[in-house]
Amino acid sequence: MKWLGDSKNMVVNGRRNGSKLSNDHQQNQSKLQHAGKDALKTGRNAVERRPNRCHGNSGFEGQSRYVPSSGMSAKELCENDDLATSLVLDPYLGFQTHKMNTSAFPSRSSRHISKADSFSHNNPMRFRPIKGRQEELKEVIERFKKDEHLEKAFKCLTSGEWARHYFLNKNKMQEKLFKEHVFIYLRMFATDSGFEILPCNRYSSEQNGAKIVATKEWKRNDKIELLVGCIAELSEIEENMLLRHGENDFSVMYSTRKNCAQLWLGPAAFINHDCRPNCKFVSTGRDTACVKALRDIEPGEEISCYYGDGFFGENNEFCECYTCERRGTGAFKSRVGLPAPAPVINSKYGLRETDKRLNRLKKLGDSSKSSDSQSVSSNTDADTTQEKDNATSNRKSSVGVKKNSKSRALTRQSMPRVPAASNSTSPKLVHMNNSRVPKKLRKPAKPLLSKIKLRNHCKRLDQKSTSRKLEMGNLVLKEPKVVLYKNLPIKKEREAEGPVHAAVGSGCLTRHAAREHRQNPGRGAHSQGDSLPCTYTTRRSLRTRTGLKETTDIKLAPSPLDGYKNGILEPYPDSGQQPTPEVLEELAPETALREEASQECPKSDSCPSRKKFRQGKPVKHLAKTEDCSPEHSFPGKDGLPDLPGPHPDQGEPSGTVRVPVSYTDSAPSPVGCSIVTPDSFTTKDSFRTAQSKKKRRVTRYDAQLILENSSGIPKLTLRRRHDSSSKTNDHESDSVNSSKISIKLSKDHESDSNLYVAKLSNGVSSGPGSSSTKLKIQLKRDEESRGPCAEGLHENGVCCSDPLSLLESQMEVDDYSQYEEDSTDDSSSSEGEEEEEDCEDDFDDDFIPLPPAKRLRLIVGKDSIDIDISSRRREDQSLRLNA
């Protein structure tokens, strides 16, 4: 590729063409004036340059530079460089590289040189390639690569007959300058040079080109000291004499600092241009320069520099570099057959083209063959392995990450605070590991969870239960988009007593079960004849229990705090769609089971494992919520009558379900999400207390967000941290507190009877996020399949508080087979709670205390991101949650 100078030289020529005649006349006069001096000093061109600088009219010629910057005039530099490349590079590469002296004096500039000058130099402009010694010269280079003996190599290179004739007219200084120039090229082949020269046929402007490729790893700001550029300042006369547009003006650039044109030759002249270079030129003296790494360079990566904005036409519109090919700009913009230029990485956010992102695109191209990745992969042509090496190294690191993530997934239950590493094969999700990634960047995670099912969870539950499987109605939920699942499974301490005691699943116990067993034993709102021992049970096990007495009138209206702690908010079917009596029966048995469990679990029955999980967390809030044990009855249009009771009119249940909302009782963990469903039912004045049960191991979590894939509608579950305010019964009084969040779920009757709208407010103006505080949750219920299941439940005498919690194992959320059983319980139970919250349209001032969590973990498929929210304002938290 041409190195430096087309447009820059054109600029110089354009500046010169305006006064070409006058300049030429004056320059000829000055040349003739000093022809005598030049004849006396035929060996040096410094004297020749002196009058040109003194009398020239161009801006950079009036600077009176009496000493050439490199010790060589531009003419000598051209001559020495041509000979050195013919001796060193041409035999090694196998073709003739670019030469400055391609022909005799051009006719347009011959008039600038006097007879004496041209005669004295024996026509130095003429380059005569050395013939017949290519193999011998190549052997010299190969030997030098082994022994690195400069003097020996130089003697071998200049041992021919041609050298005697060449040095016949050279003085000692000129011979020394030529020798040093050859050494510069020989040092390219030293083992410690860190780079090599390779053929390059990429660019249309040259047929036999070369490129510089790194042979070792270079760090940012490293100087590649052996990649040297030799500088000679050009006068206007020398430009006319030496340069021919389109032929040898590839290494000319204009120095704005010195205000003059410069000829750059040497090994650095073979550095190609790139619009996103990895190196830049830095001066190492008056006559030399080297390159400095702008970023880390991998072995095999081509070393590139930036020639300028207008080197390849206006705005580099004819540039053929790799970056232009990847971006679809420059010469590739109008090329037929190429796809329209597309943003490399989410241009909406203006992400920079970093090496990691480019390598990520490279990996994406290997897997998905997208258009962007194709343009990236096309960068690896036959003569470069730069991008391949980068992609390979990146791939290795990603493999390590995947292995780590797998091991973390296995230990997630015991390590609640270990962030799950990215396990997705899609490289576009890598940015989600950044804690400051905007929410919109997380949307590409949407398709990841589209096919996750809970079937594995259901199978585990079935295996662990000895009772017959209860068929639940199918509740179709759009697969969640983002799910936070708990890290710690809650183990049952004792098997359940009674006819279905074996049904308790020890391995997959949800948090609501823990609540049930840890609640006040005296809470006899729904005290059944059966006294169930305090055990950790799942909703499935609760459903399977029999011998329960009829429960009092039930109304589903848990406080949003319950949903906050329990997991996903569980919207209840529209009041317009009154559930069938069978469905109501299902709900009643489970509710009764929950109440029983909560009532019969003594305070003393503390789970040591829960204590262990809490570790250093304060347990004082447990006591706080203990005193809050009043029943909670919520009137609402969506409430469900007690199963045994008659089927009430649509939307108006005859009874109310007392939903114990132990919000303070369970401590949320920023790492995982435990699910807690309402266990017993208390009055609205005092939420579920059971704080004394704090001794049990409770998973702490901050928030749970589920976005429905088809509509993009999010489900949000807010969970209060263990160390937040333990008394939830004062939520109304704290409604004005900015540290509280209120979630109001109401049915959207206008659009769909199954559509629920949740309004979030934090008691204070949430700022710009206040406009986006609506959540719409749509539940689709399969009434037909629920009927027989409900009957079966009723036969067993099991009362269920909410249909969604009953359907935990058979929801079409069973796409979540990849999630752990705990996480599945999370989604199902939280859905049930959301349903319950939908029922309480009049519960406007239930404020959920914002969690003072240190971190918030979002899990998308097998990818997770930990967000540090300790230093964020409450308003910022509400904005983030509202999104």
Swiss-Prot record:
Keywords: Chromatin regulator, Chromosome, Isopeptide bond, Metal-binding, Methyltransferase, Myogenesis, Nucleus, Repressor, S-adenosyl-L-methionine, Transcription, Transcription regulation, Transferase, Ubl conjugation, Zinc
Biased composition (Low complexity): 367-378, 393-402, 761-772
Polar residues bias (residue ranges): 19-32, 421-435, 677-690
Quaternary structure annotation from Swiss-Prot or TrEMBL: Homodimer. Interacts with HP1 proteins CBX1, CBX3 and CBX5. Interacts with RB1 family proteins RB1, RBL1 and RBL2. Interacts (via C-terminus) with FRG1.
Cross-link (Glycyl lysine isopeptide (Lys-Gly) (interchain with G-Cter in SUMO2)): K555
Recorded family membership: Belongs to the class V-like SAM-binding methyltransferase superfamily. Histone-lysine methyltransferase family. Suvar4-20 subfamily.
An annotated GO cellular component: plasma membrane
Function summary: Histone methyltransferase that specifically methylates monomethylated 'Lys-20' (H4K20me1) and dimethylated 'Lys-20' (H4K20me2) of histone H4 to produce respectively dimethylated 'Lys-20' (H4K20me2) and trimethylated 'Lys-20' (H4K20me3) and thus regulates transcription and maintenance of genome integrity. In vitro also methylates unmodified 'Lys-20' (H4K20me0) of histone H4 and nucleosomes. H4 'Lys-20' trimethylation represents a specific tag for epigenetic transcriptional repression.
Class of this enzyme: transferase
Compositional bias annotation for Basic and acidic residues: 35-51, 723-734
Places the protein is found: Nucleus; Chromosome
Pfam families for this protein: SET
Gene Ontology MF terms: chromatin binding; histone H4K20 methyltransferase activity; histone H4K20 monomethyltransferase activity; histone H4K20me methyltransferase activity; histone methyltransferase activity; metal ion binding; S-adenosyl-L-methionine binding
CDD domains assigned to the protein according to its UniProt record, in alphabetical order: SET_KMT5B (cd19184)
Organism encoding this protein: Rattus norvegicus (Rat)
Top-level taxon: Eukaryota
A single GO BP: DNA repair
The reaction(s) this protein catalyses: N(6)-methyl-L-lysyl(20)-[histone H4] + S-adenosyl-L-methionine = N(6),N(6)-dimethyl-L-lysyl(20)-[histone H4] + S-adenosyl-L-homocysteine + H(+); N(6),N(6)-dimethyl-L-lysyl(20)-[histone H4] + S-adenosyl-L-methionine = N(6),N(6),N(6)-trimethyl-L-lysyl(20)-[histone H4] + S-adenosyl-L-homocysteine + H(+); L-lysyl(20)-[histone H4] + S-adenosyl-L-methionine = N(6)-methyl-L-lysyl(20)-[histone H4] + S-adenosyl-L-homocysteine + H(+)
Binding annotation for Zn(2+): C275, C319, C321, C324
Binding site for S-adenosyl-L-methionine: H98, Y203, S204, S205, E206, A210, R257, N272, H273, E320
Chief subcellular location: nucleus
UniProt cross-references to Gene3D superfamilies, sorted A to Z: Histone-lysine N-methyltransferase (1.10.10.1700), SET domain (2.170.270.10)
Positions with biased composition (Basic residues): 609-622
Name this protein carries in UniProt: Histone-lysine N-methyltransferase KMT5B
Domain SET: 193-308
Bias kind Acidic residues: ranges: 812-825, 831-847
Sequence segments annotated as region (Disordered): 1-66, 103-124, 363-435, 515-740, 760-779, 812-848
